[in-house]
Amino acid sequence: MSVDTELYFSSIRKVLGAVNVRKKLDDYDHVTDNGILAQLLEDNGYSFDDEVSAAVQAVFVEGLRQHIRSAGPFPAIDGAVQFVEHICECNDRRVAIATGGWRKSAVLKLESAGFNIEDIPLVSSDDSPSRVEIMRSALAKIGDDFESVTYFGDAKWDQRACKTLGWRFVAVGPDLGGIESYAGIDP
């Protein structure tokens, strides 16, 4: 289990106490921070509540900050920061971030890894619990008149969402046998 996932479920338990959690993230209908939380609350006899979501998010973000202070920044894949910077400079390409995380936690992790995302539209689970809707909204923020859309993701739920949307999927990281270094890759 990743540090991120451990901190996420630890934050839920700090706010709600002992709760039942499904065995795998893939067991949730929407593998996003708000999607998992909504289903976890329902599984444990609670109704989704914005105040509970805000409380869990605050504890989670503070846990991420503590992790960064003690362990250092979240690492970027070699060359990823430069790759994104280069794409942002291209006239024929657009960049948006679609994340299943909450906005505050996503920004914190990305900035700690060295990404400058100030001018990049970001859509998160604050906007929708559905990954497909998050991805559609991110595309809408940059215009949807493209010949093709390529999505870089690190999990099978990203891959499934791309299949649903008809987008090209590029696996990132070891879990899907994807890109482990952007060094030398021409966008």
In which residue ranges do the predicted regions lie?
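Active-site neighborhood of HAD-like aspartate-dependent phosphohydrolases
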Residues: 1-26, 43
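Short, basic/glycine-rich phosphate-binding loops at helix/coil junctions
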Residues: 58-67, 114-117
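Short, acidic loop-to-helix structural element flanking the phosphoryl-transfer center
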Residues: 65-97
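Conserved phosphate-coupling serine/threonine residues in phosphotransfer and NTP-handling enzymes
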Residues: 99-101
